[in-house]
Amino acid sequence: MAGKRDYYEILGVDRGASDAEIKKAYRKLAKQYHPDMNPGDKAAEAKFKEINEAYEVLSDPQKRARYDQFGHSAFDPNGFGGGGFGGGFTGGFGDFDFGGFGDIFEAFFGSGFGTRTSSARRGPQKGADLKYSMEVSFEEAAFGTEKEVTVSRLEICPTCSGSGTKPGHQPVTCRQCNGTGQVQYKQRTPFGQIVNVRTCDVCHGEGKIITNPCETCGGKGRVRKHTKLKVRIPAGIDNGETISLRGEGEHGIKGGPSGDLFITIKVKPHPIFKRHGNDVNCEIPITFTQAALGAEIEVPTLDGKEKIVIPEGTQTGTVFKLKGKGIPFLRSSGRGDQYVKVNIEVPRKLNEKQKEVLRQFAELVGDEVHEQRKGFFNKMKDALGM
């Protein structure tokens, strides 16, 4: 053990290095000295094994703690640091699978105790979902329309068809894990030798390494594109509601399904109409004479102009209902109603002739107005006990 190099020195990190720093250093060195990158180079192969041995210890918190305390002797099967009892207990239970006792031993030796996992090679992966927002007019939301949206998403590389490899070449089997996507390492404990399995850090669980990456996608298998899609806006959709387009998200990896596209609708405010559920409200002005004498007027609706009758003596704030002139029900038949509120406008400027006519009118109704006013003050006196 005395001839072995310090593990921290091998990876080129300080003893106080974080897990992330150790992992970063390992990946850099592993790629540099990997046998696939240095075919026939025995020195590089030996260096690669040395790097993996160092990382196997320093990447495991428990092993690292034992190494920091005992050095290389921590893993000497004939020494106390290796987990034996110091009296030659080297074989123990061999590669025994502790089965139901795993939870007990895990408390002492960590979650990796006796682990035998299935292949960690990553298979097909679903593409990511995408979220967009789309602005539509009040009328478009009411009656529906078809609009176009440009989506930025990752799509299958047209050059390599998603393999990530340059055409005419194939990925090579990872020598670190022999194509399994996993590496095994043995650990000696007071109960014997156990086998742990982890994802291969060289191929990241793929089992293969791309030595000739596709020039279009850089070996990733997907490229970013801006794609135009047609979106059908259903009649009756409301502000804030979402339309989902299945399979229109980012393309999957290794033949995995594509993600979905979710479009949130933003309805522009209308200068006249306000929506309440499936009903439409609006306010229109009428003149004093129209309210007093009655009239037939035109009012705006979503379908165009509609005539309504204003009865004689209509008061300001009166609401008229136009049945079936509201918003269509979403994915259903029928429509809401429209409610028209009238506001009586008082003229701000009058010429002398108009003023004279109003004075005459005031004289004609003067007694009535006086009686109404008198009645009002009498009620006030009664209420106040005057």
Swiss-Prot record:
Residues holding Zn(2+) 1: C157, C160, C214, C217
Swiss-Prot/TrEMBL keywords: Chaperone, Cytoplasm, DNA replication, Metal-binding, Repeat, Stress response, Zinc, Zinc-finger
Annotated cofactor note: Binds 2 Zn(2+) ions per monomer.
Subcellular location: Cytoplasm
Record Pfam families: DnaJ (PF00226), DnaJ_C (PF01556), DnaJ_CXXCXGXG (PF00684)
Placement of CXXCXGXG motif repeats on the sequence: 157-164, 174-181, 200-207, 214-221
One MF annotation (Gene Ontology) recorded for this entry: ATP binding
Zinc fingers, CR-type class: 144-226
Obligatory cofactor(s): Zn(2+)
Gene Ontology BP terms: chaperone cofactor-dependent protein refolding; DNA replication; protein refolding; response to heat
Main localization (coarse): cytoplasm
Matching InterPro entries: DnaJ, DnaJ_C, DnaJ_domain, DnaJ_domain_CS, HSP40/DnaJ_pept-bd, HSP_DnaJ_Cys-rich_dom, HSP_DnaJ_Cys-rich_dom_sf, J_dom_sf
Functional description taken from the UniProt entry: Participates actively in the response to hyperosmotic and heat shock by preventing the aggregation of stress-denatured proteins and by disaggregating proteins, also in an autonomous, DnaK-independent fashion. Unfolded proteins bind initially to DnaJ; upon interaction with the DnaJ-bound protein, DnaK hydrolyzes its bound ATP, resulting in the formation of a stable complex. GrpE releases ADP from DnaK; ATP binding to DnaK triggers the release of the substrate protein, thus completing the reaction cycle.
Subunit and partners: Homodimer.
PANTHER family: CHAPERONE PROTEIN DNAJ (PTHR43096:SF48), DNAJ HOMOLOG 1, MITOCHONDRIAL-RELATED (PTHR43096)
Family: Belongs to the DnaJ family.
NCBIfam families, per the entry: DnaJ_bact, PRK10767.1, PRK14277.1
Name by which UniProt lists this protein: Chaperone protein DnaJ
Organism: Acetivibrio thermocellus (strain ATCC 27405 / DSM 1237 / JCM 9322 / NBRC 103400 / NCIMB 10682 / NRRL B-4536 / VPI 7372) (Clostridium thermocellum)
